[in-house]
Amino acid sequence: MTTGFFGDVSKITFEGADSTNPLAFRHYNPDEVILGKRMEEHLRFATCYWHNFVWPGGDPFGGQTFDRPWFKDTMHAAKLKADVAFEMFTLLQSPYYCFHDADVRPEGANFAENTRNLNEIVDYFAQKQEETGVKLLWGTANLFSNARYMSGASTNPDPDVFAFSAATIKTCMDATHRLGGENYVLWGGREGYETLLNTDLAQEDQQMGRMLNMVVEYKHKIGFKGAILVEPKPQEPSKHQYDYDAATVYGFLKRHGLENEVKLNLEQGHAILAGHSFEHEIATAQALGIFGSIDMNRNDYQSGWDTDQFPNNTPEVALAYYHILKHGGFTTGGTNFDAKLRRQSIDAEDLLMAHIGGMDICARGFKAAAAMIEDGTLDQFVTDRYAGWQTDPAQDMLAGKLSLDEIAKRVEAEDINPKPRSGRQEYLENLINRFV
């Protein structure tokens, strides 16, 4: 049954690269088999609730530009929003979706009312999932929008805010578990500081570590089989966030004994804000054993803030998927479009066309990455570059079997005098361009 919001638009289908239909896929064919799996199973696309159905189109200099019939804080409006959302997921053939609690339920007067409202909409979501076959990639709690969180959630100087946050996370984990979510995400938009003048860094680190440990403990208590994911971001809205980037989060996890329990949900826009490429963050997480999932979007490279735009750069996307595929692809994770329309894109069809374009770009990048994997030249180059470390003396150094004294004696005895070797960066860049 259609809501009428998208007019007479029918399900978006694959028409091929020569199609000029703006409401068709040109590169994303969910049934195309690549590296032994359907493209849908590789990419695991998800559509986010917040940017598509909650954001009103405002910016710091102007208010609402989107006119949506569900923009009311009532349960009736929340269910209408769900009807439109699941209709859009179905039109796009998006197998997954993601949400914050505050995206989907009316705001209550207190915690108990919030919980009742969330439980009611979860009942409705369960029905919609059954009807459509759409699944939940991950759920999360909004612990940043309400004024109570202005000084943080787990890192708040007020223990009552910490307690309220913990209780809210518990209800959101319950909701995610009930809906069969495959991950649970924590993003600490207010877990940081505006000024060090009023901040106790050690205290806040202890609080954040305790909260995340409780999340892991509760996961095991309720039998949630999905992954717990932390989403790094260096700043915005906070001046400085503690989960700055992949390497920083790993240090935090290690410090609190969670490195084997928690993985990362990495966003391209957040990587850019941290001064990294997206593939850097993915490769770092893979090297540290904490890669989980991705939010696919981009930032405007000239603006300097998180613009959350849909991806449109095939070479960037290809390198991201190359590093994902190189380590076996997604397990519980997927490709969530944490991207929003521009505030002038006010038509219902704009929502569809934005996702169609993003899905096509991801498909093009993914196919290029798969071709690079199958070709094997890049991987072999890296293997050959480090081949010297497979020799017995090199393995002994790496294994800690040789001291500095012993290594120094060997260098002198064997008159080791290494010569520089080309990194061949330009050759490798040309190689990548063959595929993208």
Swiss-Prot record:
Q: Which SUPFAM superfamilies match?
A: Xylose isomerase-like (SSF51658)
- GO biological process, any: D-xylose metabolic process
Catalytic activity of the protein: alpha-D-xylose = alpha-D-xylulofuranose
EC id: 5.3.1.5
One GO MF annotation is: magnesium ion binding
Class in the EC hierarchy, top level: isomerase
Q: How is the cofactor bound?
A: Binds 2 magnesium ions per subunit.
**Cofactor(s) for this UniProt protein:** Mg(2+)
Sites where the protein binds Mg(2+) 1: 231, 267, 295, 338
Question: What Gene Ontology cellular component terms go with this record?
Answer: cytoplasm
Residues given in the record as Mg(2+) 2 binding sites: 267, 270, 306, 308
Q: Which UniProt keywords apply?
A: Carbohydrate metabolism, Cytoplasm, Isomerase, Magnesium, Metal-binding, Xylose metabolism
Active-site residues, record numbering mapped to chain:
100, 103
UniProt superkingdom = Bacteria
- Oligomeric form and interacting partners: Homotetramer.
What PANTHER family does this protein map onto?
Answer: PTHR48408, XYLOSE ISOMERASE (PTHR48408:SF1)
Q: What is the protein name for this chain?
A: Xylose isomerase
The primary gene name is xylA
